[in-house]
């Protein structure tokens, strides 16, 4: 999820805020604390009511008899295995004793609201759809659309493809 913001702080045009000495967007503490968000999540095994510890065992690549393919259903949150302490990353904190699903939602909101998301994602999309070397103006226009639309991908793709530089 931290890959959504890139490695260095960016201006809206996709260039580093300090080109001569780039500022990292996150560090080891951010990574460790964000990893704690995912504690208590595992596959949705049939034993989750009677033997939840079985849901955290690695059974190999074969599926136990009587089980359906566990990789085709959403993961399940197991509150008893979730780290209930507060988690601080990217300068924001998820409060202690927040249930696993709410912790995940709040964490994704923290990442999505980071100032790097709009320019980083916009530049990546432009590079995949139109040109590998977009101008800073092109990135700024698309990043502004991304930000103003709260990250709506349909609106962002339209801005990418309808921009004069895409023609």
What are these regions, as identified by a protein language model?
Residues 1-167:
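Active-site substrate-binding loop specific to GH73 endo-beta-N-acetylglucosaminidase modules
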């Amino acid at each position: 999820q931290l890959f959504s913001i890139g490695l260095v702080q960016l201006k809206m045009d996709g260039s580093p805020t300090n080109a001569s000495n780039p500022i990292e967007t996150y560090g080891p503490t951010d990574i460790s604390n964000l990893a704690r968000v995912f504690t208590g999540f595992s596959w949705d095994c049939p034993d989750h009511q009677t033997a939840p510890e079985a849901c955290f065992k690695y059974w190999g690549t074969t599926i136990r008899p009587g089980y359906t393919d566990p990789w085709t259903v959403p993961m399940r949150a197991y509150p008893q295995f979730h780290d209930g302490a507060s988690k601080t990353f990217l300068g924001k904190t998820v409060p202690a004793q927040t249930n696993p699903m709410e912790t995940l939602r709040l964490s994704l909101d923290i990442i999505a609201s980071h100032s790097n998301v709009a320019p980083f994602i916009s530049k990546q999309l432009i590079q995949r759809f139109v040109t590998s070397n977009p101008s800073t103006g092109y990135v700024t226009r698309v990043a502004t659309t991304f930000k103003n639309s709260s990250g709506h991908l349909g609106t962002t793709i339209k801005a990418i493809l309808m921009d004069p530089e895409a023609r």
